[in-house]
Amino acid sequence: MSSRFLRTAVARATQQRSMYENPYINRFKARSKVSEDFHKKTTGITGLFVNEHPHRALTVVYGRILRALEQIPRDAAYRKYTEAVVKQRLALVQAENDIKKLEEKIGMGQIEEVIEQAEYELETTRAIVDSKAWEPLVESAPKGQWSWPV
């Protein structure tokens, strides 16, 4: 009985893939399909797929960023400035229904790029919360470390 499982495992491990078979394309093929009536078929950027529901995606990510920022003290510079930008963009997302106009108002490229930037910002916010970057240093900085030029 165990030999049957062993044979299938060995067969899978030694199975050769043709040079024309791209696992990346097979994995993401479903994400690359866009409905016929959508205004664009591709972003023109390799690996960045068209998002047919950007308002929903941005609302979710911006909400997560704002919830993560609540864990940082109000007087921390990162929280103040990031919260201002995220709230401004969230207001734009909620106010503007047209995707092309929203891209113009945000001014950071295609809406898919804005979604990707928001996801990176969420990762950054979570990393700052984990590291507690707003707390004072464990030991004081050496004299002259922050003076420039030397």
UniProtKB/Swiss-Prot annotation:
Source species, domain of life: Eukaryota
Cell location: Mitochondrion inner membrane
Gene Ontology cellular component annotations, sorted alphabetically: mitochondrial inner membrane; respiratory chain complex I
PANTHER family reported for this sequence: NADH DEHYDROGENASE [UBIQUINONE] 1 ALPHA SUBCOMPLEX SUBUNIT 5, NADH-UBIQUINONE OXIDOREDUCTASE 13 KD-B SUBUNIT
The keyword Membrane appears for this protein: yes
Lineage per the UniProt record: Eukaryota, Metazoa, Ecdysozoa, Nematoda, Chromadorea
Entry keywords, A to Z: Electron transport, Membrane, Mitochondrion, Mitochondrion inner membrane, Respiratory chain, Transport
Record has Electron transport as a keyword: yes
Pfam families named in the record: ETC_C1_NDUFA5 (PF04716)
One GO biological process term: mitochondrial electron transport, NADH to ubiquinone
Protein name: Probable NADH dehydrogenase [ubiquinone] 1 alpha subcomplex subunit 5
Membrane protein topology class: Peripheral membrane protein
Function of the molecule: Accessory subunit of the mitochondrial membrane respiratory chain NADH dehydrogenase (Complex I), that is believed not to be involved in catalysis. Complex I functions in the transfer of electrons from NADH to the respiratory chain. The immediate electron acceptor for the enzyme is believed to be ubiquinone.
Subunit structure: Complex I is composed of 45 different subunits.
Protein family per UniProt: Belongs to the complex I NDUFA5 subunit family.
